[in-house]
């Protein structure tokens, strides 16, 4: 292992689902808009404003191109959390007098689930659909859940915890046939997997800048123009972004977001090949050296930059402490402060014991083969040590069912 350390910088970043480092090309494009090109894009009376507006519109076009949309259908927001809130609350407010039912999945991101819970208090009926043990939606259950009161179906493209890719095309077809709006939080899939809003009949899509090697604090919402979808804005003000999101646009962040989208558009295939190769290398080496390791979520229908693994018999928190040379997480970054087992893992039927042993490893554009090999060696040696110390692992080897143990409180 010492030999491996020569050209490695520790800790190794493996938390690409929570955020990504800024691509140097993105940073370079942003810098002038912090210094000499500082105009307000809404100032129409001088060249500083025109220059900023042109930069914003170029970025808007690039973001639209990545999902096959028209640039007029892209609204800038502060991130995917705001976009999700704007869709779910805004569409319910606009159409709530006509239809009052929204469908989503139990495994959606917390901001979607909590926005839905907020609406329940306002009298909107929410259906939280279960998912199959592989993490994928059951399309028959979706079909049966839609009623004549259903306004919106909200299903994320790629799950942030387990990486599974939902069948967006099939969901979009069902929604279009039943005249229901289809929203997808595509933050984890945008720029990583091909997504076309017209082919998939997506009416609204939430996007984040910092998941695609762009800056934090900027995101977007795609809102279909034909057939037109309406939302009531959350923020009132000067009427920017076609009245849907008032406030002065942050030109440097938008420029960075646009360049990040352009790079993703041009290099998506190259990035995917790189990530897929490292995924296979990582997983095959782990499987060959450690018994009783489980990949959570469907192995094939997933974005392979996400490996959520359960290591039976060892607590996730103790693994994180043992492998502190790797920046990883247990659960999503938004909920990793909680000691509760991940609600996403519980929703695919994983036992509480196994859910507590889960770690999410992220692979991205800047991950190297050397880093993967170092990570595998470190994980294997530490898991082996932790299992030797673990009475739970010992009991499992003796065939004792942990569910039947009666624990004594002290």
UniProtKB/Swiss-Prot annotation:
Reactions it catalyzes: (sulfur carrier)-H + L-cysteine = (sulfur carrier)-SH + L-alanine
Keyword Transferase: yes
Pfam family, one: Aminotran_5
Binding site for pyridoxal 5'-phosphate: 80-81, 160, 188, 208-210, 248
The organism's place on the tree of life at top rank: Bacteria
Modified residues annotated as N6-(pyridoxal phosphate)lysine in this record: 211
Main localization (coarse): cytoplasm
GO cellular component, one term: L-cysteine desulfurase complex
Subcellular location: Cytoplasm
Pathway as given in its UniProt record: Cofactor biosynthesis; iron-sulfur cluster biosynthesis
Residues of the active site: 334 (cysteine persulfide intermediate)
Role summary: Master enzyme that delivers sulfur to a number of partners involved in Fe-S cluster assembly, tRNA modification or cofactor biosynthesis. Catalyzes the removal of elemental sulfur atoms from cysteine to produce alanine. Functions as a sulfur delivery protein for Fe-S cluster synthesis onto IscU, an Fe-S scaffold assembly protein, as well as other S acceptor proteins.
The protein's name: Cysteine desulfurase IscS
Taxonomic placement: Bacteria, Pseudomonadati, Pseudomonadota, Alphaproteobacteria, Rickettsiales
